[in-house]
Curated annotation (Swiss-Prot):
Subcellular localization: Cytoplasm
A cellular component term, taken from the record's GO annotations: cytosol
Lineage, uppermost ranks: Bacteria, Bacillati, Actinomycetota, Rubrobacteria, Rubrobacterales
Gene3D superfamilies registered for this protein in UniProt: Ribosomal RNA adenine dimethylase-like, domain 2, Vaccinia Virus protein VP39
Broad class of the protein's primary localization: cytoplasm
Cross-referenced PANTHER family: DIMETHYLADENOSINE TRANSFERASE, DIMETHYLADENOSINE TRANSFERASE-RELATED
Name of the protein in question: Ribosomal RNA small subunit methyltransferase A
Reaction it catalyzes: adenosine(1518)/adenosine(1519) in 16S rRNA + 4 S-adenosyl-L-methionine = N(6)-dimethyladenosine(1518)/N(6)-dimethyladenosine(1519) in 16S rRNA + 4 S-adenosyl-L-homocysteine + 4 H(+)
Keywords: Cytoplasm, Methyltransferase, RNA-binding, rRNA processing, S-adenosyl-L-methionine, Transferase
Length: 262
C-alpha cells in the first residue's frame, strides 16, 4: 500500500530529488512580487506548502508533480481553491505549450536532480515565462550567475545569460527543508532578456564546441575550417589567438559566431 493510501505522510524520495519546503518566510521570498494578474508555473509542488502561498497571491497556479504519492496531500493543501490546476507529469517531458492560459511566472522549489536542464529548457521553449524565481542548490545558482574567468563559468552560464539576467536573490539554510539537504541552497531570480540573439541555436552549438576541452585554446576546439577564422575573429574582439572559452563573455560568443559563420 502506498503511503498516501495508508494515511501516512509520504516520505521524500531521494531519486526524485525531493526536499520539501517547510518554512513560511522562505515561501514568502519565493512568492514575492506575484499578483492576481500572474499565471504561475510551479514544478515539484510536493506536499503543497509553497503552492498554498502562491495560490494566495496569483490568479492561477499550474502545479506539475511527478510523484503520485504526494498528490492527496497536495490536494488537501490547496483545499477548495479554484485557482490551482494540478498536472501529474514528468517536468522534463511535459508539454508546457499545452498550458492554458500560458504561465508568465515560474515560482518553485525545484527538484535538485533536474533543476539545471529544466531551467534552460524553460528559457528555450516557454517564451511566455517572463520572470522566474526558484530555489536550487547554491552550486547551480553560482553556475548560472558566474562571470567570465571564474571557476564556475562555463557553457551553462553562457546560455542562461544569453536568454536571461540571473541573480542570486537569497541564500537558504538547509533547515528550511524536510529532509535537510547536505548542500546549501539559494533563491535565484531570472528576468527573460528581450534582446536574446535570434541566432541562439547556432551560438549554442558554438558554445558547446568551445567548452569541449577547457584546457585547449578556443580555436583548437572548433572544426578545422573554422579555426583560422576563429583566430582572426578573436583578435577583432580584443582577444588573443590563445584565448580560452572561459575568457569570453556571452556577448563575445554571439559576435564570434556571427564573424565565423559562412
Amino acid at each position: 500500500m502506498s503511503p498516501s493510501l495508508s494515511g501516512r505522510t509520504p516520505r521524500p524520495k531521494k531519486r526524485l530529488g525531493q526536499h520539501f519546503l517547510k518554512d513560511a518566510n522562505t515561501a514568502r521570498i519565493v512568492a514575492a512580487g506575484l499578483t492576481e494578474r500572474d499565471v504561475v508555473l510551479e514544478i515539484g509542488p510536493g506536499r503543497g506548502f509553497l503552492t498554498a502561498f502562491l495560490a494566495e497571491r496569483a490568479g492561477l497556479v499550474h502545479a506539475v508533480e511527478i510523484d503520485p504519492d504526494v498528490l492527496p496531500e497536495l490536494r488537501r493543501a490547496v483545499g477548495a481553491r479554484g485557482n490551482v490546476r494540478i498536472h501529474e507529469a514528468d517536468a522534463l517531458r511535459f508539454d508546457y505549450g499545452a498550458l492554458s492560459p500560458p504561465p508568465n511566472r515560474l515560482a518553485a522549489n525545484l527538484p535538485y536532480n533536474i533543476a539545471s536542464p529544466l531551467v534552460l529548457r524553460l528559457l528555450e521553449e516557454v517564451p511566455s515565462l517572463e520572470r522566474m524565481r526558484f530555489m536550487v542548490q547554491l552550486e547551480v545558482a553560482l553556475r548560472m550567475t558566474a562571470r567570465p574567468g571564474s571557476k564556475d563559468y562555463g557553457a551553462y552560464a553562457v546560455l542562461i545569460q544569453l536568454l536571461s539576467r540571473p541573480e542570486v536573490a537569497h541564500r537558504v539554510s538547509p533547515r528550511v527543508f524536510d529532509p535537510p539537504p547536505r548542500v546549501r541552497s539559494a533563491v535565484v531570480e531570472l528576468e527573460r532578456r528581450r534582446d536574446a540573439p535570434e541566432d541562439y541555436r547556432g551560438v549554442k552549438e558554438l558554445v558547446a564546441a568551445a567548452f569541449r576541452s577547457r584546457r585547449k585554446r578556443l580555436p583548437n576546439n572548433l572544426p578545422g575550417p573554422l579555426r583560422e577564422r576563429a583566430e582572426e575573429a578573436l583578435a577583432g574582439l580584443g582577444h588573443g589567438p590563445d584565448a580560452r572559452a572561459e575568457e569570453l563573455s556571452p556577448e563575445d560568443f554571439v559576435a564570434l559566431y556571427r564573424r565565423i559563420s559562412p
